[in-house]
Amino acid sequence: MLGLWLLSVLWTPAVAPGPPLPHVKQYEVVWPRRLAASRSRRALPSHWGQYPESLSYALGTSGHVFTLHLRKNRDLLGSSYTETYSAANGSEVTEQLQEQDHCLYQGHVEGYEGSAASISTCAGLRGFFRVGSTVHLIEPLDADEEGQHAMYQAKHLQQKAGTCGVKDTNLNDLGPRALEIYRAQPRNWLIPRETRYVELYVVADSQEFQKLGSREAVRQRVLEVVNHVDKLYQELSFRVVLVGLEIWNKDKFYISRYANVTLENFLSWREQNLQGQHPHDNVQLITGVDFIGSTVGLAKVSALCSRHSGAVNQDHSKNSIGVASTMAHELGHNLGMSHDEDIPGCYCPEPREGGGCIMTESIGSKFPRIFSRCSKIDLESFVTKPQTGCLTNVPDVNRFVGGPVCGNLFVEHGEQCDCGTPQDCQNPCCNATTCQLVKGAECASGTCCHECKVKPAGEVCRLSKDKCDLEEFCDGRKPTCPEDAFQQNGTPCPGGYCFDGSCPTLAQQCRDLWGPGARVAADSCYTFSIPPGCNGRMYSGRINRCGALYCEGGQKPLERSFCTFSSNHGVCHALGTGSNIDTFELVLQGTKCEEGKVCMDGSCQDLRVYRSENCSAKCNNHGVCNHKRECHCHKGWAPPNCVQRLADVSDEQAASTSLPVSVVVVLVILVAAMVIVAGIVIYRKAPRQIQRRSVAPKPISGLSNPLFYTRDSSLPAKNRPPDPSETVSTNQPPRPIVKPKRPPPAPPGAVSSSPLPVPVYAPKIPNQFRPDPPTKPLPELKPKQVKPTFAPPTPPVKPGTGGTVPGATQGAGEPKVALKVPIQKR
């Protein structure tokens, strides 16, 4: 706090002393100060470039000092990120950049709960940060990160008042909008959703290139835009990852000032040139062309994961946050969101004066920053559709540009969880500093994770949405719900047959395209075909319900061409696929055309085309076949063939997992017992080993007589006679030795010359084999010269009669005294 106070005292920024900015009404000049910070725990090595993993800046304004804590958005660029541009000779170049560094950061403002920041640091600081309901923008006045910067609120930004070109009548896939806010929420609304991902491909046209002046400037602009869009969608558990960028200095299709024409041309170009060439989920055009009227963007509704997944965006603001807000809005349409104004009773917690919500129809001087509750309900309804599977494809997190980083909300190599930065993390199961589970936790996220524990097997984690969907159950081992599965193709459903998780019918397709009052046209309409341009009609003589889709009633869609003609039984309407009528909407694949038949490749074919007959027979009446022709077991039964109950499988798994533990326990007990037994044996043998080392060994020949060895004998210790200075045991009977032919040396005068009587054992000593006498005469024994301070050697005892045993240990200068050996019974 003292540091911040000092900064506020030292910094007294002047108001608008710099050069005038044509796009800003008023601003303050600030000098950001980069704060010293310790290197991130998992910061990348220096070869990754000049932009560190985390940064902190202090921004002093009139009356406030804001401290921004930023972390590099390492997930901004996907592993397959490419850039395509035109070379000087006109040839097209595509580069897949490796170890691509960038300067895009996200973060928060210290001391402000719920704050957010999206900043570029390439040439000074450029971006925004939000404190409460106020959005602050910052841009450099020179290229120094600590030089002069213009800082202003969003309300002071001068820009074109923009609107979205999407009209309510174009919300074909969403049905009627009236009172939708009161409709029942999806059944799985309360089930936590896992993170979904939009792999984004961006195209910048020639007008945008000319406007910004260089390829690098366009690239930096696009990265700033996507970085901001990603930040906005994190609120909805979505991540936006840029996988491709094209920069044109010459347009590849006609870009009209009419947004709808440009959108149709753009999507046609995508289908012909981009689809299948570079994997992506959504494509966005950023154009420098000024669209007619107030329109700044247009998109297809509920089109993500389809061939219509895309939008066009006019770069209408000097600040990149402007076009980013437009792109976030149009991407919302692709994700099934409608305008907040089109839903009666829709509530946005942010007032319009403060920017409103992202899906408001018009963009004012303040940029929106949150989604309304209506948008969240629309999104939840859209993602439950089976055709949105592309959103669940997790990008290869181990190949993100920049490598794994703790705190980016992606669980990467070496991490058990990732709940964001320590300031943002609200997950009690995850340590945000280490990205490891807290002690005692089994999981931190996932629909099969509850209070840090994996849910038991058999609990529902994803409800079925309709007759063509299947509910999924937790397996008791993983915190994530199994892959979304649905009924096998050809399963009967209301009015038709299931196909890829949906139940396509002619009636539903007419309502989707022409509104709730539409219905299927008479059969006579389906006996005609329409040539391109709706120039007449051709009678085929037979009914074909698998060609062009003919409807009647409903509302005529705006900005869509259509063809109308009369038949014997009514009016036939055919809807064009775009603003022209060269092609028409066709009946969808899998639509029921006759009893037991479906549309496939433009013709009415038997259900056997699905090759799914008798598939469920292998599921033992406890499950059905899914779209992968695998058994999807009923609740309580275990895959793969639904023969065993989950409880039995769990018991077997528990037994199999406990078997190694029991084996280890038994081994530990056995080892412990062996150690104890070995200890007892060693303990009992220890005195004997000491005694053996203390007494003379049993002689095997006359040469073993200890008197024949000098003190420097090289015999091993266990065969060497006892040293006179060693302690000799008195607890064992004397062992017989060979009787020497010469008398022992005379003892010192202090000791009596008459030997002490030696007791005889009462029991008979066992027969012992006497060693043979030496074959050669023994050498003359010379007595050793002993210093007065040492005791003389003990005289030997006759074998077989028992004898004296040397006394206890003698001290220096103390004579040895023969002791009586205690009588022991054998």
Swiss-Prot record:
Transmembrane segments: 659-683
PROSITE patterns the UniProt entry points to: ADAM_MEPRO, DISINTEGRIN_1, DISINTEGRIN_2, EGF_1, EGF_2, EGF_3, ZINC_PROTEASE
Cellular compartments annotated: Membrane
Cofactor: how bound: Binds 1 zinc ion per subunit.
Binding residues for Zn(2+): 329, 333, 339
Residues forming coiled coils: none
Residues carrying a glycan: 89, 260, 431, 614
BP terms from Gene Ontology: angiogenesis; blood vessel endothelial cell migration; canonical NF-kappaB signal transduction; cell morphogenesis; cell-cell adhesion; cell-matrix adhesion; cellular response to hypoxia; leukocyte migration involved in inflammatory response
Renumbered residue ranges of the record's region Disordered: 701-826
Function comment: Possible involvement in extravasation of leukocytes.
Name of the protein in its database record: Disintegrin and metalloproteinase domain-containing protein 8
Originating species: Mus musculus
